Design a protein with these regions (language model features):
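Structural beta-strand/beta-sheet cores of well-ordered domains, especially the beta-sheet scaffolds
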Residues: 35-41, 45-47, 91-95, 150
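Generic recognition of flexible, low-complexity loop/linker segments
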Residues: 25-28, 36-39, 49, 81-85, ...
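Short beta-strand scaffold segments in enzyme catalytic cores
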Residues: 47-53
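ATPase catalytic-site recognition across NTP-hydrolyzing enzymes
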Residues: 1-41
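Mg2+-dependent endonuclease catalytic cores in nucleic-acid-processing enzymes, primarily RNase H-like
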Residues: 55-185
Length: 190
């Protein structure tokens, strides 16, 4: 429409309150010197990390590290490099991941958290694995303004995260008559 590219969306977006005009930064979000860095990680063969800072009660998401068909050992190196090159001004680094990443692989004794720590990254399981708690935490920030600015702002370079917010992360339509959707979001690449 109007010569603009769009995406085909199937399902019901998890975050319908996400508005590109409001939640995507117009300019690059700079690193706030002396402010802690927070990183959220999801493991698997497509590991991903979201990197941001909480500055004056606003979550500023500055970067993402998304890998395809990459193990946790290589991903840890890529993440460590991203932190060292782009975020050296941050005061502390807090890394949290899916608590399922604390279970040992059947092939050896290590867990993703052990591997991250071995790479010099202090990472810990998130306090809860509740999907509802995570969804509500993000939705609450998307619905809030702080000093006239969005409480949750994403750097435009975070393309996968933006695609997820823009409908890629969705409740799958159920194969029944009517508009019925699954109770939990579809576990896809977002």
């Amino acid at each position: 429409v109007m010569n603009r590219l769009g995406t085909i969306k199937d399902g019901k977006p998890v975050y319908p309150m996400f508005a590109s005009e409001t939640h995507i930064a117009k300019e690059e979000i700079p690193v706030a010197a002396g402010i802690p860095l927070y990183i959220g990680i999801d493991f698997g063969l497509t590991p991903a990390a979201v990197i941001g800072q909480k500055v004056r009660n606003r979550w500023l998401i500055q970067s993402e590290v998304v890998a395809f068909d990459m193990g946790i050992v290589r991903f840890a190196e890529v993440l460590r490099n991203e932190i060292a090159t782009r975020f050296s001004q941050a005061s502390d680094v807090y890394i949290y991941g899916d608590p399922a990443g604390d279970f040992r692989a059947q092939t050896d004794e290590s867990t993703p958290f052990h591997i991250l720590r071995g790479a010099g990254l202090r990472a810990f399981p998130a306090p809860s694995n509740s999907v509802d708690l995570r969804l509500e935490s993000v939705a609450q920030q998307l619905n809030k303004m702080v000093e006239g600015k969005p409480a949750f702002l994403v750097d435009r370079r975070c393309s996968q995260l933006i695609k997820g917010f823009d409908g890629g992360y969705a409740y799958k339509r159920m194969e029944v008559s009517g508009e019925r959707y699954a109770d939990k979001p579809d576990k896809n690449m977002y």
